[in-house]
Structures are given as C-alpha cells and as structure tokens.
From Swiss-Prot:
<feature type="binding site" description="in other chain">
    <location>
        <position position="299"/>
    </location>
    <ligand>
        <name>IMP</name>
    </ligand>
</feature>
<keyword id="KW-0658">Purine biosynthesis</keyword>
<feature type="binding site">
    <location>
        <begin position="407"/>
        <end position="409"/>
    </location>
    <ligand>
        <name>GTP</name>
    </ligand>
</feature>
<protein>
    <recommendedName>
        <fullName>Adenylosuccinate synthetase</fullName>
        <ecNumber>6.3.4.4</ecNumber>
    </recommendedName>
</protein>
<dbReference type="InterPro" id="IPR033128">
    <property type="entry name" value="Adenylosuccin_syn_Lys_AS"/>
</dbReference>
<dbReference type="InterPro" id="IPR042110">
    <property type="entry name" value="Adenylosuccinate_synth_dom2"/>
</dbReference>
<dbReference type="GO" id="GO:0005737">
    <property type="term" value="C:cytoplasm"/>
</dbReference>
<keyword id="KW-0479">Metal-binding</keyword>
<comment type="subunit">
    <text>Homodimer.</text>
</comment>
<keyword id="KW-0436">Ligase</keyword>
<feature type="binding site">
    <location>
        <position position="13"/>
    </location>
    <ligand>
        <name>Mg(2+)</name>
    </ligand>
</feature>
<feature type="binding site">
    <location>
        <begin position="40"/>
        <end position="42"/>
    </location>
    <ligand>
        <name>GTP</name>
    </ligand>
</feature>
<dbReference type="GO" id="GO:0044208">
    <property type="term" value="P:'de novo' AMP biosynthetic process"/>
</dbReference>
<comment type="similarity">
    <text>Belongs to the adenylosuccinate synthetase family.</text>
</comment>
<feature type="binding site">
    <location>
        <position position="40"/>
    </location>
    <ligand>
        <name>Mg(2+)</name>
    </ligand>
</feature>
<dbReference type="InterPro" id="IPR018220">
    <property type="entry name" value="Adenylosuccin_syn_GTP-bd"/>
</dbReference>
<dbReference type="InterPro" id="IPR001114">
    <property type="entry name" value="Adenylosuccinate_synthetase"/>
</dbReference>
Amino acid sequence: MKVSVLLGLQWGDEGKGKVVDVLTPKYDIVARFQGGPNAGHTLLFADRKYVLCSIPSGVFQGKVNIIGNGVVLDPILFKAETETLTSSCSNLVDKIYISRKAHLILPTHRLLDVAYETQKGNNKIGTTGKGIGPAYTDKVSRNGLRIGDIDYNFEEKYRYAIARHKELLHQMNFQYDLLPLEREWKKSIEVIKRFKRINSDNFINKALIGGRTVLAEGAQGTMLDVDFGSYPFVTSSNTICASACTGLGVAPAKIGDVFGIFKAYCTRVGSGPFPTELSDEIGEKLRNIGNEYGSITKRPRRCGWIDLVALRYAVMINGVTQLIMMKSDVLDTFDTVKACIAYEVNGQKMEDFPFEIGSSVKPIYTELVGWKTNMTKIKSENEFPKAFKDYLLFLEESLGVSIKIVSLGPDREQTIIRE
C-alpha cells in the first residue's frame, strides 16, 4: 500500500477539513504530518461545527488518528480540543496516537512568539502568537522537547529549556507572567499522558505492509511553505507533499495519490504578497458570501480572483495527481469570473512563479462568463450549467490535472465526485 496525501495549494484555508471528512471512509489511518495549532480544519458533524487544530480530521469516522513527528503540539490547546470532542467522539484515547518524536510547544514559546513579533515593529509577518515558530526554532537548533521526553527526566529537561527562554525574554526586555500559563500547561501534560505515545514511523510503515490504507493530512497551504512560499510571510514548517515523508517517516516511493485542494478564488490571512487581492466591493462580496474569516483567529481573510500562476507552481511542487475545488458556489451570482493567467513584472509577461512578489507584480487576467446559477442543491455533475463546465475545463487545461471533486457548500452532501 501507499500513502495518499491531502494538502492545500494556496495560502491555507482551502477547506481541507471537509474534504478529509469526505475521503476518510476509504482509509484506515489519518495522519497529520506538519504544523501546529495555528491552523484550524473546520468540519460539520451531527449538525455541529468543529475546528480541529492538532487532531486529524478522521476522528469523527472512528479511524486511527496519528499526530506525526512533524507536528508541534501545544498540550493546553490539545487538551481543550479533546474536551470539545468528548460529546461527539467516544473513546478518544483509543483513536488518537501521538508520535514520540513530535515536539512540544512550551508555555514560554508563546511568550517568545509575541516578543519576537513585537520587536519587528512595522515588519510584522502576522503570526498567530501560538508559539509555533519558536518551537520549530528549538527543534532545528536541537534544543526542543519531544513527546517522548515526558517519560525520561522530563522535569530536568523542561527546567533547562524554560531557563533558556527566560534569558531570551529578559534580553528583549519583554514583560510577562508565566505562572498561570505554566500551571495550565502542566495540567495539560497529564492529559497527554492518557494517550498512546508511539513510534509513529514504525507504526505507519508496518500498517502499509499489512495492507492498511493511510491518508496524510497537511495543514495550511503550499504558498505558506517555509522554502517554497512567499518568504518571509510564511509558516515555520514545510507544507508541501515532500513533508509527508519527513513528517511521518515514510519513503518517497511510498507516496501514492496527491490530492491538491484549492478554492475557486483566492484568500489569504495576515500580511504578505497577494497579487490578485481585491480591495473593492468584489473582494468584500467574496468575503461575505464565502464567510471568509479565520477559523482560529477570526481575522477577516483577504480575497481575490484565482491565481493560476501560483496554482500551477503548487501543482508542480507537490506532484498533484487529482485536484479538488472548494467553494465553487461562492461565485454563483457573478456575471463574470476572472482568472490570473500570468504576471506583468516591469513591463514583461511572466508565467512562472517568481523568486519574490513585490509591488511591481501585476496580474494579467482572462475573463470567463459566470454561470449565474444556485448550485448548492446540485447532486450530479450532469446538472452543472454549461458556463461552470467551461470554467472547470479551462482550469484543468491550465493546470494539467483533472478536477476530481467539486464542493458546492459546507455540508458533506454538497460534494460532487466526478467520473
């Protein structure tokens, strides 16, 4: 068996949570391979909305859910997340496994995150302040604490890390009150101890050999990747397909289908370049119809037309085999729909994604006829209006990959799987 990978192709918030919920019946194991609690996957289950930050989205389907070694885990937020799930998901401790190699977000990581961002002044990158960046910094500098450390001289390692962080905070002259946060953090560690802490790399590889199916679930989006995104306005981890290998411990040869998710338009939260951003009534219309507000931060998302330059790049980097288009229904009322097919940079046409996106980058659009049809009740692709079929064909020809799934609303039933 091979691992299927599901990831976002834009700046995050593509709708991965719903798609995982749709796909999980086919899989035995769902595994998160990177990121932290700065991104939320929104799912509807039993008429209730849930936002999952660290727990894989297969939890509602009774699957084995693995938090992989590439994830950074905040015990406080993990505890809170499990508490919101107890009414809908029984026996959580039997469904969620945590990699011993996953790194912990310490209470001082949150403080450092805020302190670093404050120091940047006008050059802020829009961090969520959840401590993800400092946790990954400790990881690569070989100073981090891992889940497995809970069972080995943990208090000594913890005290050493906290003392080092306090010194950094002192150097930045940052005022803080650690005690309440630390007290809550230590209570939350006791909750983590109830869950199975495993060598997830061995577990997943043995599962594949045994014929079990695995879906690797990414967080955020390709254009936020620390290497291939719009640096420095990116997240602190690799969000692309290759990260499923390093974040779960599986070989590249064991990667199978790569499902790439994108919206029928574009959104972005926080600072950073966004070539197709619309700061007019059209952008506001997209935001209102699409309810474009961060699932965790509640920040209004910046909205714009679909960017095929960035999307082609994301498809290439990830080796996408099947595309999934979300929120098609948001465009139902538009007379015309635009798509960015290239950039103009200093008077020159550019079809490849550039090293840096500055103010000189201007989108070059093509305009398509809108379908002007309420598609939220459609049950089959045969019911798609012709203009929407033309839009799908245009996207497939532009991206070189077929669109397998089309989402027409937030509910699981509003999902069309194409032949």
